[in-house]
Amino acid sequence: MNPAQDLLETRYHVRLLRGAEFTRDSRLSDMALKSTIYKAELQIADMDRHYYADHALTIACHPSETDERMMVRIAAFALFASDRLEFSKGLSDTDEPSLWCKDYTGAVQTWIEVGQPDERRIAKASGRAEEVIVIAYGGRTSDIWWQGVRSKVERLRNVTVWSLGEGVAASLGALAERTMRLQCTVQDRTAWIGNTTSEPVAVEWTVFKAPENV
């Protein structure tokens, strides 16, 4: 074999090795970022909406997601529960919301965001879904966030924005366990969420923006 052929074969093997290393590193990365699975049996008695049902929930919690955020997602499910509402991939897929409800054709009816999304993400969701609900939390930081996005978000007619009360997310986070049995009662625009061993958390919110009639 001449020197030119030796060089070509060497480069070929280097590419193979690099490809193998890339595949191995990708698998290790996927393993490192693997979500933790939580299970929750949720009993809902919503007297405001006349909705009464039990739900068996499976929640994938991304390594970067806090207990507080995960439990706010569960609270959001309880507040807007329906037969078709479901958790998305969450932080594992930035193109999906925290929760959503689709019709039988796959069209998005309800898009629920938890946290403090920027105005571009909210606008994009507004164009994809019939209604968008943002549930912010964090007390004072939510107020600052809202002032930053308000001027643009208020133009979006199908968007609702709520802000949970100070300390609510932290109190919900304290309920987090890998396997949970939760009860949620909703009456007069207040929800109480608890388990069998602790006092229920009063979940109250301020309406930053209500949807307009379309």
Model segments located where?
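Long amphipathic N-terminal alpha/beta scaffold segment
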Residues: 85-104
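Short, hydrophobic/π-rich interface segment
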Residues: 147-184
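Acidic-basic catalytic patches of nuclease active cores, encompassing PD-(D/E)XK
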Residues: 46-91
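Conserved catalytic cores of phosphodiester-cleaving nucleases, focusing on short active-site segments
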Residues: 99-101, 106-122
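Glycine-rich, aromatic-bearing surface loops/beta-hairpins
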Residues: 180-214
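A short acidic, amphipathic alpha-helical/loop segment
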Residues: 121-125, 148
